[in-house]
Amino acid sequence: IFWGSISQCAAQKIAVKTNLLYGTYASSPNLETEFGISPRGTVDLGAGFNWFTSAHSSSNNKLVHWLGSVEYRYWTCERFSGHFWGIHILGGQYNIAGHHLPLLFGDDSGHYRYEGWGIGGGISYGYHFLLGNRWSLEANIGIGYVRLHYDKFRCETCGEKTGTENRNYFGPTKAAVSLIFLIK
């Protein structure tokens, strides 16, 4: 049974997936499509967004954003099976308020609203677990660099702009536990 699963996996050319961590933490619908380009190489295209704000919040808490990414993956055995290494680029726009994100915006980040964009890239490592003929689970983590450019606003009223800033971020750029459907 195990050998049959591995041989079927080698024939896979396309995977459609959703990152369960990102979807849960950021309440963000997201979708990725991964294409086989060689026996050990794939390209993963991902997108996620959150256009929702809390209707019950008088403090204007929000995590509004869109994010896109492209990753080349090199599989150590064969694509869509086992270990892989990747190199990725990412970019997006955001409007964030009421969230304490010190790695991105500093220690006082929970007291301001940030509206801007970011672009970056990094390297990643992951492992693909076969669950059945068509279903899989994948764990992936990445580190890298992101350049952030944003306008900063006082969060109490979220109207008074206090300045425009740039920030260089080095650290985790990817964390995923993805549910995958394999297409032949």
Residue ranges and their predicted role:
Residues 47-65, 94-118, 146-174:
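Extracellular/periplasm-exposed beta-strand and loop segments of Gram-negative cell-envelope proteins
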Residues 2-9:
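C-terminal segment of classical bacterial N-terminal signal peptides
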Residues 70-105:
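Helix-adjacent hinge/juxtasegments
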Residues 12-14, 39-43, 79-85, 115-119, ...:
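Outer-envelope beta-barrel architecture signal
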Residues 9-67, 177-184:
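Short glycine/proline- and aromatic-enriched beta-strand/turn motifs that initiate or cap beta-hairpins
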Residues 18-22, 35, 45-49, 85-93, ...:
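Transmembrane beta-barrel strands of outer-membrane/channel proteins
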Residues 35-39, 74-80, 129-133, 183:
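Outer-membrane beta-barrel strand-turn architecture
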Residues 73-75, 169-184:
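Outer-membrane beta-barrel "beta-signal"
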